[in-house]
């Protein structure tokens, strides 16, 4: 019993002598395609021709048979040379094996086989396949909407529009028909991807008698019929290919919506100059400095007293005494010496608080560039009484002269005009 089973297993593995090339193959693989010549040869219904070693002799090209044998085992090797591919196709036709000529043929065969086994529509299988690669199945076609009506001896035929998708064409038909699309007088028929609407008072049987080749309509062009006495209208949405070669068309990649975060990441990943973004005005009068006492101010750019603070100090008699002793250059950002009035512009913060003129802070060794002039509107700091006339005293033509305390590198000016040293 065991010897009989072993003999059957040995018979399932066959030795082949194809054009002098020796191969070993399973009977099941050779009979993979039921309608092929190999399946008929090794089905057991016909005697096999063998050589001295017992191998089955097949008088064909042994080198090309290797491609077919690998294909029967589930492997596909497509030759690169055109001459070899043509010769291989002849061998495949001789044995009745659907060997693919190219990779696209192989994918098409596998897709059709998968659709039949899984009971899935081929179009959906192709769509899923393209979705896996982020591609869209596209064919260069347009949809043409024809209109035709006949009444007695008159006939009118025209094109309503050309559309890029069938959905746009269907919407155009709905717009043309309006409420008549659901009428009993409307007859709809389809052929392939094309659709036709016929409006008349005739029944379908009567239309078949009047219209030429009514049942043989394949959706191509407009169907003409024998001229009846009643009015008949016809709308035909036909798919037409664009002129040109498909070989030059590249696959269209799917468009996807990019989230703002992804777009920001994509912009940051790019090299080169980044786009300039508006972050508000270049200057701001709402500047608050914390721990201002710890900021070291350079002597050359020490804050200068403004006219109202000078007038307040002039009440004590010190400003007049120091006016001819020293001349300090104008600080950066307070205007030009020829235009002293530029430092007293009407611009001011909304809360009306008094701010100090800008000072050059030594935060680094880099040379500070001149800033824009900040025009501030200041409230009077003068008290009532004897100091009141000093506020209305006209300023001298030149820039105000500071007291010697203003030249102290450690001094800072407060809002009331007093010097505060650390």
Swiss-Prot record:
GO biological process: protein homooligomerization
Bias (Pro residues) ranges: 396-406
Listed InterPro entries: KCTD18_C, SKP1/BTB/POZ_sf, T1-type_BTB
Composition-biased stretches (Polar residues): 413-422
Disordered as annotated region, ranges: 289-357, 376-422
Record domain BTB: where: 12-80
One Pfam family from the record: KCTD18_C
Domain of life, source organism: Eukaryota
PANTHER family: BTB_POZ DOMAIN-CONTAINING PROTEIN KCTD18 (PTHR14499:SF4), POTASSIUM CHANNEL TETRAMERIZATION DOMAIN-CONTAINING (PTHR14499)
The protein, known as: BTB/POZ domain-containing protein KCTD18
Gene: KCTD18
């Amino acid at each position: 019993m065991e010897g009989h089973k072993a003999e059957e297993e040995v018979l399932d593995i066959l030795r082949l002598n194809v054009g002098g090339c020796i191969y070993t193959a399973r009977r099941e693989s050779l009979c993979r395609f039921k309608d092929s010549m190999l399946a008929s040869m090794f089905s057991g219904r016909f005697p096999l021709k063998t050589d001295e070693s017992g191998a089955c002799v097949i008088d064909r090209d042994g080198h090309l048979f290797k491609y077919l044998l690998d294909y029967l085992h589930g492997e596909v090797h497509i030759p690169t040379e055109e001459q070899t591919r043509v010769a291989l196709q002849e061998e495949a036709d001789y044995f009745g094996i659907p060997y693919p000529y190219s990779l696209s043929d192989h994918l098409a065969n596998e897709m059709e086989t998968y659709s039949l086994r899984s009971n899935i529509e081929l179009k959906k299988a192709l769509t899923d396949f393209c979705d896996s690669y982020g591609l869209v199945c596209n064919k260069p076609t347009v949809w043409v909407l024809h209109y035709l009506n006949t009444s007695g001896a008159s006939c009118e035929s025209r094109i309503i529009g050309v559309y890029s998708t069938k959905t746009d064409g269907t919407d155009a038909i709905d717009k043309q028909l309006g409420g008549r699309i659901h009428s009993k007088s409307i007859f709809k028929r389809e052929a392939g991807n094309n659709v036709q609407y016929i409006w008349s008072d005739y029944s379908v049987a009567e239309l078949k008698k009047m219209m030429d080749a009514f049942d043989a309509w394949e959706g191509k062009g407009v169907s003409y019929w024998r001229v009846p006495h009643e009015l008949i209208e016809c709308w035909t949405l036909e798919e037409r290919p664009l002129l040109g070669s498909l070989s030059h068309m590249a696959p269209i990649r799917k468009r996807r919506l990019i989230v703002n975060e992804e777009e920001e990441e994509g912009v940051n990943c790019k090299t080169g100059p980044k786009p300039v973004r508006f972050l508000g005005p270049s200057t701001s009068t709402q500047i608050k400095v914390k721990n201002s006492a710890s900021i070291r101010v350079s002597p050359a750019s020490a804050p200068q007293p403004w006219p109202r603070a000078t007038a307040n100090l002039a009440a004590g008699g010190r400003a007049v005494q120091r006016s001819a002793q020293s001349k300090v250059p104008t600080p950066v950002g307070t205007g030009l010496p020829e235009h002293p009035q530029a430092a007293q512009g009407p611009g001011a913060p909304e809360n009306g608080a008094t701010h100090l003129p800008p000072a050059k802070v030594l935060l680094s060794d880099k040379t500070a560039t001149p800033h824009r002039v900040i025009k501030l509107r200041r409230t009077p700091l003068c008290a009532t009484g004897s100091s009141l006339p000093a506020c209305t005293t006209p300023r001298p033509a030149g820039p105000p002269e500071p007291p010697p305390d203003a030249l102290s590198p450690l001094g800072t000016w407060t809002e009331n005009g007093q010097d505060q040293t650390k």
